[in-house]
Swiss-Prot record:
Primary location recorded for the protein, binned into one broad class: cytoplasm
Protein name: 3-phosphoshikimate 1-carboxyvinyltransferase
CDD domains with a match to the protein in the record: EPSP_synthase
Gene symbol of the encoding locus: aroA
Family: Belongs to the EPSP synthase family.
Length: 434
């Protein structure tokens, strides 16, 4: 089996922060410079819908740290109502973040627009998008099954509200916040279970933590947003795959540079450290309100099996669960997950996708509506094992890491889907292999 050593300086820029930086730049008054913008398919979809809606922007390469070439995006805008009616439906491709968050902005624009996506995105539920926007005064139409296309008749007369999030969703929280920026008063968003907080940090919104554990986000309406520069750190959700590679391949040592260490994004590091993983952080600092640092990962032996059952914990590792599940199964033979029904409405039904593929690899699994359990390995299949990616980048990468680290020969369908979030995935892995 292979061993992996070295430092990673070219992880994809954070996907979540890149989306928000572009959208906030389009809402700002002036020139917004975004340094180290993500080149992933999803983030490029956000830039494309902005341009199709009349926002002027340029994207170019420039010199970055560690001798890298990085992307720089410059957005010119005139504030909250700078958008123009698109001439055709806005294509979000596979990006649920683009579709959901941009819907909040379009709800406040005085024209009709339509948001569409690829075949996968058009199957994902969008009632959670439509409901708060309708309450604020926008007209929103979905398909009969509650999915895209999303047809929005926006209005400049949105009104503020107090909105309690029905599920833990940073995307829904953000779309309500973006709409509320245009509303006629102060909006209060109540978050029972805390999700990633990039939108609040980047907009400088007031937050109030309640004694019962809830968080209230205060969004002032019709306030000018001054343009400011953004720097995008490395994506912790992408880093999860490199961390797993180091932990599965015995004798490996990897350093990941300039990683976003926002506490709402690094729950998986705490979970793995608690299971016996050799993980440490150095060179910590804060840039633009976000914690950043270098993460050192050392393979120190077998990990304890992972049990993820606390709703707050699930919310903070929702994107990393596929890799955590595969890592735990291959390391200890066991894994258990509860309170994660949200996974069934991602790019694929990730619970089912994980179970199907783990069973092909000889693991005994049991799934239920909000999670699943791995109960050990019955037998190791011989020869090449076919893995179904379900056209889901995180499923594809999770099993690719397992195959590379353990030497199991896997044939993964539609492997090019990794480009959605991690275009240089295989290039980085190959650079680390000793």
């Amino acid at each position: 089996m292979s061993v992996f050593k070295g430092e990673v300086t070219a992880l994809p820029p954070d996907k979540s922060i890149s989306h928000r930086a572009a959208l906030i730049g389009a809402l700002s008054d002036g020139t917004t410079e975004i340094v180290n913008f993500s080149g992933g398919f999803d983030n490029q979809s956000t830039l494309a819908v902005l341009q199709a809606s009349g926002i002027a922007l340029i994207q170019e390469e420039c010199a970055g740290s560690y001798g890298r070439r990085i992307r720089r995006v410059v957005i010119e805008s005139r504030g909250l109502w700078s958008f123009l009616a698109p001439q055709a439906p806005l294509m979000c491709n596979n990006s649920g973040s683009t579709m959901r968050m941009f819907a909040g902005i379009l709800a406040a624009q005085p024209f009709e627009s339509v948001l569409e996506g690829d075949s996968s995105l058009m199957k994902r539920p969008m009632n959670r998008v439509a409901d708060p926007l309708r309450q604020m005064g926008a007209q929103v139409e979905l398909s009969f099954s509650g999915t895209a296309p999303i047809r929005i008749q926006g209005t400049k007369d949105l009104h503020s509200l107090e909105y309690r999030l029905p599920v833990s969703s940073a995307q829904v929280k953000s779309l309500v916040a973006f709409a509320a920026l245009h509303a006629d008063g102060q909006t209060r968003i109540i978050e029972p279970i805390r999700s990633r907080d990039h939108t609040e940090l980047m907009l400088g919104l007031e937050t109030i933590d309640q004694p019962n554990g809830e968080r209230v986000i205060i969004v002032p309406g019709r306030k000018r947003i001054e343009s400011k520069p953004f720097y995008i750190p490395a994506d912790p959700s992408a880093a999860c795959f490199i961390v797993a590679l180091a932990l599965l391949a015995k004798g490996s040592d990897i350093i990941i540079r300039d990683l976003c260490l926002n506490p709402t994004r690094t729950g998986y590091l705490a979970i793995l450290a608690g299971a016996g993983a050799g993980i440490s952080v150095e060179n910590s600092r804060v840039i633009g309100g976000e914690a950043i640092g270098d993460v050192l990962v050392h393979s120190e032996g077998e990990l304890n099996s992972l049990v993820i059952s606390d709703p707050h914990e699930v919310a903070n590792v929702i994107d990393e669960i596929p890799m955590l599940a595969v890592l735990s199964a291959f390391s200890s033979g066991r894994f258990e997950l509860h309170h994660a029904a949200e996974l069934r409405t991602k790019e694929s039904d990730r619970i089912d996708a994980l179970v199907v593929n783990l069973e092909r690899l000889g693991f005994q699994c049991e799934q239920y509506p909000d999670g699943f359990k791995v109960n050990g390995r019955i037998a190791m299949p011989k020869g090449v094992v076919s893995i179904e990616s379900f056209d889901d980048h995180r499923i594809a990468m999770s099993f690719a890491i397992a195959g590379k680290a353990t030497g199991v020969d896997l044939a993964i369908s539609d492997i090019g889907v990794v480009g959605v979030s991690f275009p240089n995935f295989f290039e980085i892995i190959e650079s680390l292999e000793v």
